Design a protein with these regions (language model features):
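N-terminal segment of the mature folded domain
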Residues: 23-109
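Bacterial N-terminal signal peptides
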Residues: 5-16
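Sec/Tat signal peptide C-region and signal peptidase I cleavage site
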Residues: 18-22
Length: 109
């Protein structure tokens, strides 16, 4: 869960560079179990972000099996945030997608 929040925070850094008038939309590709977690977290984050920046943000979700979701991203699904629950799926994102450093497990134990 901490990794999920860290990834979401990373995506937010990218939002800071968005033009003030732009509507920002994030796509979070996640595994099924997190559906209820984000159902509660996303509205709280949208409010927090609006209060802090004055900007609107919309969060879209894509849920599925972790391995299926990882494969979708490697195959071209343009995710802003990726939350996986299996280390082999994160390894796939590193090896085939180049989306995370190969040493991610040492950097984020």
């Amino acid at each position: 869960m901490l990794r999920s929040l860290a990834l979401l925070a990373s995506a937010l850094l990218a939002l800071a560079a968005a033009p003030a008038s732009a509507q920002v939309t994030l796509l979070n590709v996640s595994y099924d179990v997190m559906r209820d977690f984000y159902k509660d977290l996303n509205p709280a984050f949208v409010k927090y972000y609006k209060d802090k920046t004055g900007k609107e943000v919309t969060i879209q979700m894509s849920h599925g099996g972790s391995s299926k979701q990882a494969r979708s991203v490697v195959d071209g699904l343009e995710a802003d945030v990726i939350t996986m629950n299996q280390s082999n799926d994160i390894d796939l994102l590193a090896a085939r997608g180049g989306l995370v450093p190969a040493d991610w497990s040492k950097r984020l134990p």
